[in-house]
């Protein structure tokens, strides 16, 4: 996929994900994340890739989660139920072993990421 076909925030993050793709794998989006520990969330046609910066000694991990291992994707909000469903900029991706919470720079990015992950889970 050409860069103009991929939604992304930072070119260096897109390049980092592209360097780790499997043969034939396509990137749909790479969103910069805010908050402690998370660098970005990438969504491909085969998996979700999380960059985790929370390791001791300034080490960084890239974690791949195949869609078949994701048990749920959630919208996380501090508000009571009501109003716009996607007025939050945080989603959570759960597996049988952990839940990964990702805060984005805007509710529109959270909405897009949530819908892409959910679409792949339901295929």
PLM segments and residue spans:
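Terminal and domain-flanking low-complexity segments
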Residues: 107-123
């Amino acid at each position: 996929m050409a860069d103009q076909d991929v939604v992304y925030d930072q070119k260096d993050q897109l390049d980092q994900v592209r360097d780790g793709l499997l043969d034939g794998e396509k990137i749909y989006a790479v969103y910069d994340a805010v908050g402690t520990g998370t660098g970005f969330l990438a969504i491909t046609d085969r998996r979700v890739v999380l960059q985790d910066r929370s390791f001791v000694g300034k080490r960084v991990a890239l974690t791949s989660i195949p869609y078949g291992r994701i048990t749920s994707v959630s919208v996380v909000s501090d508000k009571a139920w009501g109003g716009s469903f996607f007025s939050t900029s945080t989603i959570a991706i759960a597996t049988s072993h952990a839940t990964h919470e990702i805060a984005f720079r805007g509710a529109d990015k959270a909405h897009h990421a949530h819908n892409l992950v959910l679409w792949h889970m339901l295929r």
